[in-house]
């Protein structure tokens, strides 16, 4: 907190609430914003069972019924594979479940190329916040680009309160600043095969460096 951190996003890859209890208590005790996470993914073809909107709704109700102190909820699609309809149904149900003023956040990666459509579905369902990135480190295993999202929202009832021309200038400066760093080509890749073996974007980047 003394170094400027205000929020900690707290997640367990298997959605085991027991693994979020003590860490959540410590985050709140330190006076930080505790954003508790429900991990999402789409199952590969031929797999059935977990990771349905009903599963996520059950997880959310378990969180609300627990004694874990938290301030907001993030739905985290680490592999970027959840199809937009599932996103919509999950967020729509969550919005009806949590208090009206509670922040619902969606985090995804653009590894499968559907990040923008996921966010549009989430916005229609009532999401509060989404995570975006800035070129040259947007897209692929990172988050969708902020300018692309701004463009995709044209003609809808929503927009991003940004000046796109200023962002273009900022991205030019950022690209120059990043020119001395190696960016693995795999980290910029969009692959149609990701939904067949969902791997988190961060894990994919780390394992190819």
Indicate where each model-derived feature is located.
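Catalytic cores and adjacent flexible loops of soluble metabolic enzymes
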Residues: 1-9, 13-209
């Amino acid at each position: 907190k003394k170094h400027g951190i205000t929020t900690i996003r707290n997640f367990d890859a298997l959605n085991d609430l027991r693994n979020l209890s003590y860490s959540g208590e410590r985050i709140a005790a330190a006076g930080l914003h505790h954003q508790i996470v429900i991990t999402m993914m789409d199952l590969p073809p031929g797999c059935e069972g977990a990771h349905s909107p009903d599963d996520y709704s059950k997880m959310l109700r378990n969180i609300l019924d627990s004694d874990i102190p938290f301030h907001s909820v993030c739905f985290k699609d680490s592999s970027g594979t959840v199809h937009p309809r599932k996103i919509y149904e999950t967020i729509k149900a969550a919005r009806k479940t949590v208090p009206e003023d509670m922040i619902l956040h969606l985090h995804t990666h653009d590894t499968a190329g559907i990040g923008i459509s996921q966010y549009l579905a989430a916005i229609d369902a009532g999401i509060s916040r989404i995570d975006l990135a800035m070129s040259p480190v947007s897209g692929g295993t990172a988050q969708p680009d902020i300018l692309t999202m701004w463009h995709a929202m044209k003609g809808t009832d929503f927009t991003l309160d940004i000046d796109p021309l200023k962002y273009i200038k900022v991205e030019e400066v950022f690209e120059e600043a990043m020119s001395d760093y190696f960016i693995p080509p795999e980290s910029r890749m969009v692959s149609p095969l990701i939904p067949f073996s969902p791997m988190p974007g961060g894990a994919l980047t780390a394992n190819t460096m």
